[in-house]
Amino acid sequence: SVDIVRGPASPIYGPAKIGGYLNFNPKSAKVGRGQYLDEPTGAMSYTTGSWDKNIVTAEVGGPGKVSGKDFGYYIYAEIENSDSYYRNSETDQTVVQAAFDMDLTDKLSIEFGGMYHKYDGNQNAGWNRVTQDLIDNGTYITGDAQPLDTDGDGSISHWEYFAENLFVEVDPLTEDGSSFSDAMALVNVGTAKLGRDQTLIAADDVLANEVSTFYFDMLYYTDNGWEIKNQFFYESYENLNENAYGFSQFHDAYVVEDKIVFGTEYESDTLLAQFQFSPSVRYTDFESGDDFINEFFDRRDLTGESTALDRRLLATRAGWGYSNYDVGNYLNLGMAAMTDLTWESGLNLVLGVRYDSVDVESTTPGGSTLFGGDEDVYAEDSEDGFSWNASISFKTEIGLIPYITAAEQATIVAGQGANIDVENIPGGYFDTSELFEYGVKGSFLDDSLYFALSIYEQERTDINAQSTVTNNTTNNEGTEFEVRWVVNEQLVLSAVYTNIEVTNLTAVASSYQFGFLGAEDFANIDDPSIFFGGTPNGNTAYDNVEAVKAGIPENTYGLTATYDFLNGYAASVSVVNADEVASGYSGAVTLPS
């Protein structure tokens, strides 16, 4: 199962961003301390559906004994081979999970297991040549980009792109088309109705991932009430992402962590106090390359397949020409402590603190990047920081629980491949996130009716791979409301509402946000086909003075009803409505509600 956890992570977990996290729980034969499944169990399933969906799963688990010791096991496997609604898209994946539990003594037990996941599919960049008419009516501007593949190898190299100067910085408020060369114009221009399944996916696009995970936990219970847990964790992954329009990347990384958690509790007539403290060490090793220079989205005509008119020679295939290439590692040493205090009166106080130190080194190998030269570029640095969180709540006699939470967390700001770019050392790879939240929640009608209301503000930093010198800091303000009602043993109703606004503080400070400019960004250009063969770029903040992040609806509403017929069948229906929202940072194109 997967837990979606909102808010700050416990300091015991390690350095993390404020916005929440996913917690993966492997299936286990253990149902409590010293307790296992009563008998072996298992299941098989086959799922089919539209677009040739095929998923087969099998699982088996149960109790046993090894050398007279209680033992439990659970193994799960899944294989999928499915097509997709989108053209040129399919999914092939294999998942194997295994979990084992064993009581060595009445005080010492072990839990270990792992997961292997292999995925083959593709990335979907959606539509290109986007206009408001395309969004509203499906009307697409057709036409061919002019040929650039002068050596006839079937792909456009960086040098063939550079020869025509198709990446042009302009001011969208004043540009009238005079800055664009003739080579940027489409030929055989027309219009067509575009299907929603026709996207930028090319037949030879690749998104491949292979992940291996292993964990080994030892739990010891002392005579004086302490729980001592040693947790070992290892994960490695390889990723390859190739897109014909001009983006590719690879990641090869692994992480090893060992953490010891000491926990105890004290109970009196009026107070239950729980305490934990934990030292940890975490080592990350990475090799990663991104290839996004000469990324031309609009050259391909989506009414046909990708051809030599739009297909770029990718760095992952050529073996060089990356925009950035990083090889390195970092070591994170941490110490954390937290307490959870609950008084009989209903008052609860949770406090946590953490200290982290990070040593990082990164190298860009000579000859690997497009403009980096033949010499290695090396950087190293050390950083440290504190994290803390505090939450206070009060459970009233009528079931209402008002609460306030505040937190600040220091974390490593890494790329998608756990990589740290040489250009971000020092100063750009370690930062803090902040959160302040308050709200009220409660249960009524014998806990059959639950609701929660929260109002929050958070600030966090994200890495921007295409602007590696400056990481973007965002401020999020929002309100969330949820209610769930178990009406009876057959009917469950739920409703949700969210209000959120995400502001790019980096853009507010600079009044600048780099981006690609599209058809609706130019008030003085009536025919965007004159530049669809290239990429105009510049400041997309020209009409977004409040620096609101695109693609996030301000208001979202949802209703769900589930009915169990008590004969092995159940039905559910959901209705979701979201506000209209800008598709890009400039707000030139609006996606409907």
Give each language-model segment a name:
Residues 272-291, 297, 324-460, 476, ...:
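Structural signature of Gram-negative outer-membrane beta-barrels, strongest in the C-terminal barrel
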Residues 26, 46-52, 79-83, 94, ...:
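Transmembrane beta-strands of outer-membrane beta-barrel pores
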Residues 58-62, 98-102, 214-220, 258-264, ...:
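Residues on the lipid-exposed face of transmembrane beta-strands in outer-membrane beta-barrel proteins
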Residues 68-73, 107-112, 225-228, 268-273, ...:
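Repeated loop/turn-to-beta-strand initiation elements of outer-membrane beta-barrel proteins
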Residues 448, 454-459, 471-589:
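Gram-negative outer-membrane beta-barrel transporters
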Residues 94-283, 450:
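Outer-membrane beta-barrel domain signature, strongest for Gram-negative TonB-dependent receptors
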Residues 11-97, 104-109, 212, 449:
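Outer-membrane beta-barrel translocator/receptor signature
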Residues 124-198, 295-321, 360-382, 414-426, ...:
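Solvent-exposed loop segments that connect transmembrane elements
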